[in-house]
């Protein structure tokens, strides 16, 4: 009836981001129309049960009393209990009742989508589909004055994915997660895809600042633990091309070396390449070791040649053909 009467829009459709509880209630109705099942039944069958979430409910009256948390609001210097809300059409936007132990299973589903790989897929959703949810599809804000709860200034860009909030800060840290609140409750879950860590905060206080709490917790964990982002494992072809490049450096004797794209030497003069490499190797002195390539992706990376007096960085990019060949090459001195 609400939709039949017509809706009022804050902005012209498709022009701006604005969160809408009504939008998620409509999605719940769409699930029913498409599947022929109430959205809660469909979600139970396709997500909740396959993940083994045995302490997750839609209706508070079905929860064992010893497991049910009651919500409160701080009013006039006193805690007042909030009435629990019964399940209904708007449950699609915030009606799920769960435990930390259960929700960890759901968060792990998202965390296990990273890093991208070709392992056996999960039964609930493909990793690629989950990563689609994690993308910043709709930019919302850039807060150049943002400060972490500890007071450290760091600009943060925010966007919205598929039902999830996305942020990226001045240190290159990306977070994905979601917050929620109802009278008597507040919640947030946030994870860092490139670090493999996440936190969940549930509170039985009206609109508790769980997002701020989790942000501070994650920032503290990273500061104390010194955890670094995941490192991509070099592909076999990157390792192979690195070895083959080292076999021709610095003299650039490419005879019998079919490792370059057909247009490589149209972009580069072999005499200039040879002169540049010889000069850098002479400056470096005796070569101590060649470090393993650090990949940017499966077809691009850089490695360091450690010399007695200076180091050398070599970067290269491969073509996307079946047997990738060197398309782009850069070399430079890294002073010690």
What are these regions (language model features)?
Residues 114, 183, 206-208, 332-335:
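A short acidic/small-residue loop/turn micro-motif
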Residues 1-181:
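Short, surface-exposed loop or secondary-structure junction motifs
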């Amino acid at each position: 009836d609400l939709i039949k009467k017509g809706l009022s829009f804050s902005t012209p459709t498709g022009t701006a981001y604005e969160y809408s509880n009504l939008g998620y209630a409509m999605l719940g109705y769409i699930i029913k129309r498409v599947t022929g099942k109430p959205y809660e039944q469909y979600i139970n069958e396709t997500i909740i049960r396959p993940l083994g979430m045995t302490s997750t409910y839609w209706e508070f009256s079905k929860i064992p009393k010893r497991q049910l948390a009651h919500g409160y609001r701080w009013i006039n210097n006193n805690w007042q209990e909030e009435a629990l809300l019964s399940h209904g059409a708007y449950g699609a936007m915030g009606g799920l009742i769960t435990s930390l132990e259960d929700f960890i299973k759901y968060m792990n589903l998202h965390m296990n989508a990273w890093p991208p790989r070709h392992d056996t897929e999960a039964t609930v959703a493909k990793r690629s589909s989950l990563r689609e949810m994690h993308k910043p599809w709709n930019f919302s804000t850039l807060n150049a004055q943002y400060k972490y709860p500890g007071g450290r200034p760091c600009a943060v860009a925010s966007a919205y994915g598929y039902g999830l909030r996305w942020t990226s800060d001045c240190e290159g840290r990306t977070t994905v997660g979601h917050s929620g609140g109802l009278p008597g409750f507040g919640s947030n879950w946030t994870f860092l895809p490139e670090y493999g860590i996440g936190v969940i905060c549930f509170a039985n206080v009206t609109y508790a600042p769980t997002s701020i709490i989790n942000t501070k917790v994650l920032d503290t964990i990273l500061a104390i633990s010194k955890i670094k982002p995941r490192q991509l494992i070099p592909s076999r072809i990157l390792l192979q091309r690195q070895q083959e490049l080292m076999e021709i450096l610095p003299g650039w004797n490419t005879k019998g070396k079919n490792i370059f794209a057909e247009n490589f030497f149209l972009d580069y003069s072999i005499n200039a390449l040879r002169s540049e490499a010889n000069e850098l190797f002479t400056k470096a002195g005796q070569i101590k070791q060649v470090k393993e390539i650090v990949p940017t992706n499966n077809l691009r990376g850089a490695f360091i040649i450690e010399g007695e007096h200076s180091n050398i960085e070599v970067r290269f990019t491969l073509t996307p053909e079946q047997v990738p060949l060197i398309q782009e090459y850069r070399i430079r001195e890294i002073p010690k």
